[in-house]
Regions:
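Charged, alpha-helix-forming regions
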Residues: 1-202
Length: 202
């Protein structure tokens, strides 16, 4: 990379951080705040059974094999089919196949915050699928979707609150159905509130 390009990048980064400081957040495309990880083609019949979940595109692992193609934190967006746009978070070894994986660009976002802002747009992502037969989401279109990015400190605060609600919802799985539903609605309400940012107009 040339010095000129370096200076341009530094100026862009400085401007973005200035806007973030003045307004409290800035809108950035997914391509700016994440590092893409594309899944690999695999078949169950051509694999050896194991305990590594295969993320095929549904809301649950498709099956389990003996090898992984990613370790550490990652957010996966299902690429095709009925569940296209479904967002999941993983912090264990997995094998990503029919899905878009996104690691966080740590300069801008934490992985868990990236998960929550994508999860909050799940319906919008699902509506982006195109094509006859088995519809799919375009990776190029997905990379252009913009998200609100506050400071890393504010992200940690938001994630801390949403994590507590998520834990609470999961921990009362033995409770009454009405209580579970009420907690889930409360969680979704606060998630929407915490992740609601106005568009910045020039």
């Amino acid at each position: 990379m040339s010095r000129r390009t370096d200076r341009q990048t530094d100026r862009q980064t400085g401007l973005i951080k200035l806007i973030q400081y003045v307004f409290g957040y800035v809108w950035l495309p997914l391509s700016k705040i994440s590092i893409p990880f594309r899944g690999e083609y695999i078949t169950k019949s051509g694999s050896t059974a194991g305990d590594i979940p295969v993320i095929l595109g549904g809301q649950e692992p498709a099956y389990y094999i003996d090898k992984c193609n990613h370790t550490g934190e990652i957010v996966v967006v299902a690429r095709s089919g009925v569940s296209a746009g479904f967002v999941s978070y993983w912090d264990e070894p997995i094998f990503v196949t029919d899905g878009f994986g996104y690691e966080s660009n740590s300069e801008w976002v934490t992985t868990k915050y990236l998960f929550y802002i994508l999860k909050n747009k799940e319906n919008e992502l699902n509506s982006m699928k195109r094509g006859a037969g088995v519809p799919h989401i375009s990776g190029a279109a997905l990379s252009e979707v913009k998200f609100p990015v506050p400071s890393l400190k504010e992200q940690e605060r938001i994630v801390s609150i949403l994590d507590r609600f998520d834990t609470l919802c999961n921990d009362i799985s033995e409770g009454l159905p009405a209580e579970i539903e009420a907690r889930q609605k409360q969680y979704e309400y606060y998630r929407d509130k915490l992740l609601s940012f106005k568009e910045l107009k020039p």
